[in-house]
Amino acid sequence: MFLAVCTIDRWPHELDETVHLSIEGMEAAGNKVLGIFVTGCEPRHAFSVKETLAKYGLPVWTLPQIPFTDESTKDLALATFRKNAPTDEVLAALDVENTAPITPYAFQFDLLGKAKSNKKTIVLPEGEEDRIIKAADYLLEREIVNLIIVGDKNAILARGEELGLKFLDRARFQAMDDENVLKPMVAKLCELRAKKGMTEEQARKQLADASYFGTMLVVLGYADGLVSGSINSTANTVRPALQVIKTKPGQKPVSGAFLMCFKDHVAVFADCAINLNPDAEQLSEIALQSAETARAFGIDPKVGMLSYSTLGSGKGPDVDIVEEATKLLKEKAPDLPVVGSIQFDAAWSPNVAATKAKGNDVAGHVNVFVFPDLCAGNIGYKAVQRSSGALAIGPVLQGLNKPVNDLSRGALVQDIINTIALTAIEAQ
């Protein structure tokens, strides 16, 4: 889809604002903007207009104002259009390669659509947090997921009313002292933790924690997945899941990936949340999990095993681990495009790859970035997020039997909405 905007009687900042809001609205509706036509633009202003709009990374064509006189105006308009917007340039913008990139707005729109197409039930253990119930209200209004909110129904609804929320009553509310739920929950927890010698008294004490309580709602089948972490640490969210939901058969580590939504594409960064110093075997498993996450969200994975060395340019024990992980990954998934070890710039940029990794088809086109350890991964995703303005969705916890996802304690309402939708899709 192309955007056409008139610049008559508009200052440059007004034109920029109009274009920004228009692109945002079009992409939120699932449309990909391929180029911008600026009409009524005097030739002497064409350069400054194109310079102003260059930041959107789209082709811009400026068309001068054409006064209407008679029927001949149509022919004049067509001739003017062809002169200022050559047909080959417009057709080039329609090429498949130019329509492939996924923008953050389009990705979020698609995320909600996928979640709604096969509604699942997600439990929210932090019902007392304003951001959680605001996100819940948004999703319930649009009927995207079914929600179980843990906490006192009357207190949560009263707070929702104070915040102007109108759809919270569509959720199911689960009190933590409800014996009809608590009794079978205690029995199941004792069964699952029998090897640890858990008693009924210990189980009840454990279930006084909302994270444990919410996790057991998933175990018992009341919910398909869980989202927590807006007021609790990652450990408080992950520990119950590891103990009672456990990992998928054959999966060793649980890892945390972020979906990084850039201006023109989406990438996966891992592990940014869980594994402190993974060995080669664990790194290869994290890469496999991350490639599967990419596929689940419509991304054709091309994996880069990151290091300070590109294809042998540097040496050291850390490089050895990454190179061994790359070897294992190729053995486990011979059809998966992968390059490693590789530096971030050579993985990211085709221009850098042409010098540092000449002849490698994956270098410069990586969209699944596997960091060598948690320090690099956590710093890396936050640095890229803050410096580029990329939208970071996650972490997505990979490798669990059922989806449990952790929120940053600094998560915004939109982040929570995205994570709940993402969790629902994983449950499908």
Task: Place the predicted regions along the sequence by residue.
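Conserved catalytic-core segment of NTP-binding enzymes
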Residues: 1-58, 289
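Hydrophobic beta-strand segments of well-ordered beta-sheets in folded domains
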Residues: 2-5, 30-38, 60-61, 121-122, ...
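Structural motif
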Residues: 5-10, 38-43, 63-68, 125-128, ...
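Canonical P-loop GTPase G-domain recognition
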Residues: 52-70
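Flexible inter-domain linker/hinge segments
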Residues: 67-121
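Anion-binding alpha/beta catalytic cores of soluble intermediary-metabolism enzymes, centered on
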Residues: 98-363, 368-428
